[in-house]
Amino acid sequence: MKTREEALALDRDDPLAPLREQFALPAGVIYLDGNSLGAQPRAAAARAQQVIGAEWGEGLIRSWNTAGWFALPRRLGDRLAPLIGAADDEVAITDTISINLFKLLAAMLRHQARHAPKRRVIVSERSNFPTDLYIAQGLIAQLDRDYELRLIDDPADLPDALDDETAVAMITHVNYRTGYMHDMPSVTQTVRQAGALMLWDLAHSAGAVPVDLNGALADGAVGCTYKYLNGGPGSPAFVWVPKRHQRAFEQPLSGWWGHRAPFAMQPAFEPDPGIARFLCGTQPIVSMSMVECGLDVFAQTDMHAIRRKSLALTDAFVALVESRCAGQPLKLVTPRAHHQRGSQASFEHPHGYEVMQALIARGVIGDYREPRILRFGFTPLYTRFVDVWDAVETLRDILDTEAWRAPEFATRAAVT
């Protein structure tokens, strides 16, 4: 892709192009931040009005039954399941990634303590998203025996970090900064052969790249719905537990929604035999309902078509940045190899924050991550090839003119 006309031609031939019309994208904006917050499905506003106006406003408490609110976490989990290689009754939409990580990690450590008490080490990456590490640190601080969080600095170091004391490997499939993607089947096999349990974080994978959790024989996973799945800001996350583990994994947040019969109101907790045991308290129905609007769009295509376009978009973006912005202090930190790349492209720049603010001011929305990382997410359901061209041209002009040096672009916002 060497001209804007070529980009437009690619858009005309794109089989996913019609899906863009199902998103409410503002005019004059090139949105390359779907890896942080997905765009709004057009159906979401009407769905919100339906839930608030009719189901809540008119149905009131009856809607737990008549509108299917009570079954929503499991029903939507079943709809999400094919996107991550899961089966029915293995996924629940609920809580946040942080809370679901706590549940699963605690359940896995408890399981190992019963069957292999010597195993007390959690292995993860130093570059993992901080909440994963914070949750592990907080959980370790609460346990009454010596546990250890062992961090590796390179994916190649994982085999050497695993030993007969390893309980769980907690790895994020696609790195949030760089977009590096692990080989899920290979990593899972390595971890399981070492006698440890494999816990995946799919925050930057679900809806972005094909995932096959059951095919990889993973032991558990968490993910969010507000990024590539377009569930809306703060939409609930998901938890996956394969059927072979569900009865054996006992999560610590034994709230009433995880009981086998919540409305029996029994004084003693008896966990649900299926994935519902990983629920805790009353669910956020309004925000959860929005998740279905994003899943409705995914039902019109498949992850292989999405992946093909994702790679084409990121290939084009990287090539254009390196040709059109040649001579600028930009360093690609995202892998070039397709099998190691998620659905983003990240570049390091000495003044990355200021450059990104200048881009946003001109309607090209990506985001910034420390240290010095310009991060661009590509969501094939609505990102066009002409967006790639126009975004790079805007970046080139900002760098050539040093427009990023304007004082207002150095002011740090609370969210970057």
UniProtKB/Swiss-Prot annotation:
Listed NCBIfam families: kynureninase
EC code(s) of this entry: 3.7.1.3
Q: Which residues bind pyridoxal 5'-phosphate?
A: I97, S98, F129, P130, T131, D132, T172, D201, H204, Y226, W256, T282
Residues of the signal sequence? none
Q: Does the keyword Hydrolase apply?
A: yes
Q: Which family does it belong to?
A: Belongs to the kynureninase family.
Protein name per UniProt: Kynureninase
Q: Does the keyword Methyltransferase apply?
A: no
Top EC class of this enzyme:
hydrolase
Q: Name one GO biological process term.
A: quinolinate biosynthetic process
The record, for PANTHER family, names:
KYNURENINASE (PTHR14084:SF0)
Pathway note: Amino-acid degradation; L-kynurenine degradation; L-alanine and anthranilate from L-kynurenine: step 1/1; Cofactor biosynthesis; NAD(+) biosynthesis; quinolinate from L-kynurenine: step 2/3
Could you tell me one molecular function GO term of this UniProt entry?
A: kynureninase activity
